[in-house]
C-alpha cells in the first residue's frame, strides 16, 4: 500500500472541508448572485446603528453591545438591538450565535431569548414592523410577526402581528415549550447545548422565507410583509454572542 504524498493529503483535506461546509448550507441549491456582504468582520459595528429602549439611538453607555475577541457580546441587560444601516431584499444570511450565562429582568430566570428581525421598516422602537427569526431556548426557528408584519405559513394560514404586538408561527416539529432558563425541546431540539455555537441561516427570495438552524429546515413561509428592509439583532434579557454575520445577494 502506497503512502499518500503530502500534496494528496492536502487536497483530500481541502475536499473534506468543502463538503463539510456544503452539508450545513441550505442555500447550496440557490447560487449567490453577488459578492458576500460581510456585516460583521470581527472588529467593530460600523455597519450597524444601536438602539436601546431607555437610551435611544446610538447611545450605549453601559456597553450592551460590545465587540471583544472577534465576536459581538450582547449583555442582554437592556432591551434593544443593533440594526443594519442599509435595507436588503433577496439574500442568504448566515450568522452564528451562542448563549451566555445571564438572564435579566423582566425575563430573569426565563428561557433565554433573542432574535434576528428582518424586513424591518418604520420608526426605531422596541419592536419595529418586521418578521423575526426567533432565537429562544427550546424554540429557535419560530417566526414572530411584529407590529403589522405578516406571513403565510406552510399550512396556508396567514398570521399578522397586531399593532405594537406580535404573533407566532411555531417551527416545524416543535414540541411542548416551557418558559424557563435552560429549557430544551424534548421532541425536536435544534440547538446545540448551551455554550456551543449554533449556525442560523435565512433565505429570502421575493416574499418567500426559509429559516434553518444548524443545517436543518426550521420554518418556511410565503407572502411576507414587508418583503424587504433592515436587519436587526436583539438584546432581550439574556446574554449571548454573535459572530460571522454575512449576507449573499440572490436572484429574485
Go through the PLM ranges and name each one.
Residues 1-6:
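N-terminal secretory signal peptides that target proteins for export/translocation
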Residues 24-252:
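Carbohydrate-interacting regions of secretory-pathway proteins
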Residues 10-20:
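Bacterial N-terminal signal peptides
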Amino acid at each position: 500500500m502506497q503512502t499518500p504524498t503530502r500534496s494528496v493529503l492536502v487536497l483530500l483535506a481541502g475536499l473534506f472541508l468543502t463538503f463539510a461546509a456544503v452539508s450545513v448550507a441550505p442555500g447550496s441549491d440557490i447560487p449567490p448572485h453577488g459578492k458576500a456582504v460581510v456585516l460583521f468582520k470581527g472588529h467593530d459595528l460600523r455597519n450597524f446603528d444601536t438602539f436601546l429602549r431607555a437610551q435611544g439611538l446610538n447611545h450605549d453607555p453601559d456597553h450592551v453591545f460590545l465587540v471583544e475577541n472577534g465576536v459581538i457580546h450582547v449583555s442582554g441587560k437592556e432591551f434593544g438591538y443593533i440594526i443594519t444601516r442599509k435595507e436588503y431584499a433577496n439574500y442568504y444570511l448566515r450568522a452564528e450565535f451562542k448563549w451566555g450565562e445571564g438572564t435579566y429582568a423582566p425575563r430573569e430566570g426565563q428561557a433565554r431569548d433573542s432574535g434576528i428581525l428582518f424586513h424591518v421598516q418604520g420608526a426605531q422602537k422596541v419592536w419595529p414592523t418586521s418578521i423575526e427569526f426567533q432565537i429562544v431556548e427550546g424554540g429557535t426557528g419560530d417566526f414572530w410577526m411584529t407590529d403589522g408584519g405578516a406571513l403565510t405559513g406552510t399550512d396556508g394560514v396567514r398570521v399578522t402581528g397586531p399593532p405594537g404586538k406580535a404573533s407566532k408561527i411555531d417551527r416545524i416539529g416543535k414540541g411542548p415549550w416551557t418558559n424557563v432558563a435552560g429549557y430544551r425541546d424534548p421532541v425536536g431540539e435544534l440547538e446545540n447545548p448551551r455554550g456551543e455555537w449554533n449556525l442560523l441561516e435565512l433565505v429570502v427570495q421575493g416574499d418567500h422565507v426559509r429559516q434553518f438552524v444548524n443545517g436543518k429546515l426550521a420554518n418556511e413561509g410565503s407572502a411576507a410583509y414587508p418583503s424587504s428592509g433592515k436587519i436587526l439583532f436583539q438584546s432581550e434579557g439574556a446574554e449571548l454572542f454573535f459572530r460571522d454575520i454575512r449576507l449573499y445577494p440572490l436572484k429574485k
